[in-house]
Amino acid sequence: MIFNPTVASITLRSALGRRRALLYAIPPLILIGVSAILRLTSPADPSWPARVLGEFGFSVVLPLTALIIGTSVLGAEVDDGSVVHLLATPVPRRTIITTKFTVAVVVTMVFAALPELLAGLIATGPRLALGMFAGALAASVIYNALFVCLSTATSRALAAGLCYVLIWEGVLANLVGGARILSIGHYGLAIASSIAHDPALKPGVGLATACVLGAIVTAGTLAAAVRRLGSFSLRGETA
């Protein structure tokens, strides 16, 4: 069994509680707002939708949302020691990771992928919107696998993840061509571009490369997270 409804329910309540949903909503609301403003002020410019939804959406909004959600579904329990309650139950470590990962992906899709769809519909129409939505769905999966793994590796997962998002995804992947092959944002853009066929998207990798590397990153980071969680003792420390 790779999904535990009880763990999922507790994780979902925690993820959406304590006003966290408002925090998740801020970046996508900015994306939708910017798209609406540009639609009104620059309706004749065909280049801005792909730039805003692609560069800003996939390099800033999506990874930041996934970072906050992905590191919180397990990281908070590791930090405060309450993870020992999970480790003391008969629920397998693999099931804990996959369940929390699934919840993180679903919440990220709601707060990041759906806003990409809405912003795309506002900006141009269904073709670009569907492409961005599909790319955002795929990127949500890969990003959350990475950030859930990161939360098992360090108590400063949010800070480490923020450095990754800002430096690697936000700067290097958009300025250095070779860095794009290891950019989750560009994996999502490749999928979006294959559907939208918008030359302004400019993904740094091809569709096949994005799918293969995305699958490898997802499987590898989840496997590492399971192994790392399995090294915790019942005191919440690594063995």
Q: What annotation goes with each model-predicted range?
A:
Residues 1-25:
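Aromatic- and glycine-rich beta-strand/loop motifs that create alpha-glucan
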Residues 23-25, 161-162, 237-238:
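Short, hydrophobic secondary-structure boundary micro-motifs
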Residues 28-76, 80, 97-164, 201-215:
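Secretory targeting signals
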Residues 34-43, 154-198:
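Transmembrane helix segments
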Residues 81-87:
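Short cytoplasmic-facing helical segments at TM-TM junctions of multi-pass membrane proteins
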Residues 149, 216-239:
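Junction motif at the cytosolic side of a transmembrane helix
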